[in-house]
């Protein structure tokens, strides 16, 4: 999904085909060898092999031909002790890796990689829509009467062992390769090598930048206000304003709010809402447009290497030997359809703790939106005891999925999430009047009170509240 923190030139984990130089040159053959061997050498010289540049963030227990083992069935359930392997439709999840920086080195690791048939794009701005209920993104194909993603497992061992085909080759990394519906709706390429659209090594260095925002003017904001004042805009009884006992219909909501906003800017009625014990709406400025009323010291900042992966190791692809079948222990051999040098990083990305603008914006959204979202969108942090009482502070301060703010893309438009408009705790935070009432009553979000409206304003109370 969209990731504003990704370096502008970092690729996704990907694959490409490339002509591989043969290990045996036809000119070096002994004179006695026949022409068939020369032709075979020339053909081998032109053979295309798959190259890999990827990250395998998830550590596992071991790797077999079934994939990466990520656990063992609990003793309390049926099949206790049974090995649990990653569900290839969505696991390993690309955002799940080591939980702390000092974890032990992984002896078995797994990750996801895009097949060579998925066009290479920079990670910055890349988006692939989910195709299953677990969040997997593989393209679905009709197989045996049902739609399934075509995920293939690719196994890798340290380059030296596999190349020399020494005994007891064991894979140390497994990549789950798939095609996805790759899109870049919010970015465009700012640098692209001269390679057409096909995947290639030079395309790893593509760079992206965000699209320019296209502002749209609202033509109807002040229709009815620019030409005449019908008194309907004012939200008062017709007889009070015009001295005529005529009824004039109210304008549409957009025009009415615009007029109220104009009155608000040239008058001072909102300064005195506490006098009348009212919570006057801020209308557009404070409710529809996000302002900062929260803490900004919430999240650590990181900076990543330009390639998005940093330190890699060189691996050679391996495959199971066909002779084994399902009997006995699996043995492995070199897979010559892949290049001899495939660069794969194991574990978390190399990073240091800071894109400052992206982090400031992300922190702003987290502290002004995420922290005030309804409780159903929050969850308990791992290993932390949280009260079940929804009115307690620790229950209110549970953590929010980062995706809820990561998917909010600031391209210059002013808009709000659905929850900003129709969820009470959030409106309580956004609304200037309600926010001020909270300051008077204390720093709580759960305060039962009744908003009182003086009867002299009965005709416009719906506009005020």
Swiss-Prot record:
GO biological process: microtubule-dependent intracellular transport of viral material towards nucleus; symbiont entry into host cell
GO terms under cellular component: host cell; host cell nucleus; T=25 icosahedral viral capsid
Entry-linked Pfam families: Adeno_hexon
Major subcellular location class: virion
Keyword Coiled coil: no
Annotated compartments: Virion; Host nucleus
Keyword Aminoacyl-tRNA synthetase: no
Region (Disordered): 1-51
Polar residues: compositionally biased ranges: 15-24
Acidic residues bias (residue ranges): 27-36
Induction of its expression: Expressed in the late phase of the viral replicative cycle.
Signal peptide coordinates: none
Keywords: Capsid protein, Cytoplasmic inwards viral transport, Host nucleus, Host-virus interaction, Late protein, Microtubular inwards viral transport, T=25 icosahedral capsid protein, Virion, Virus entry into host cell
Subunit structure: Homotrimer. Interacts with the capsid vertex protein; this interaction binds the peripentonal hexons to the neighboring penton base. Interacts with the hexon-linking protein; this interaction tethers the hexons surrounding the penton to those situated in the central plate of the facet. Interacts with the hexon-interlacing protein; this interaction lashes the hexons together. Interacts with host dyneins DYNC1LI1 and DYNC1I2; this interaction might be involved in intracellular microtubule-dependent transport of incoming viral capsid.
Record's function text: Major capsid protein that self-associates to form 240 hexon trimers, each in the shape of a hexagon, building most of the pseudo T=25 capsid. Assembled into trimeric units with the help of the chaperone shutoff protein. Transported by pre-protein VI to the nucleus where it associates with other structural proteins to form an empty capsid. Might be involved, through its interaction with host dyneins, in the intracellular microtubule-dependent transport of incoming viral capsid to the nucleus.
Other remarks in the entry: All late proteins expressed from the major late promoter are produced by alternative splicing and alternative polyadenylation of the same gene giving rise to non-overlapping ORFs. A leader sequence is present in the N-terminus of all these mRNAs and is recognized by the viral shutoff protein to provide expression although conventional translation via ribosome scanning from the cap has been shut off in the host cell.
Similarity remark: Belongs to the adenoviridae hexon protein family.
The protein's name in its UniProt record: Hexon protein
Organism: Human adenovirus C serotype 6
Lineage per the UniProt record: Viruses, Varidnaviria, Bamfordvirae, Preplasmiviricota, Tectiliviricetes
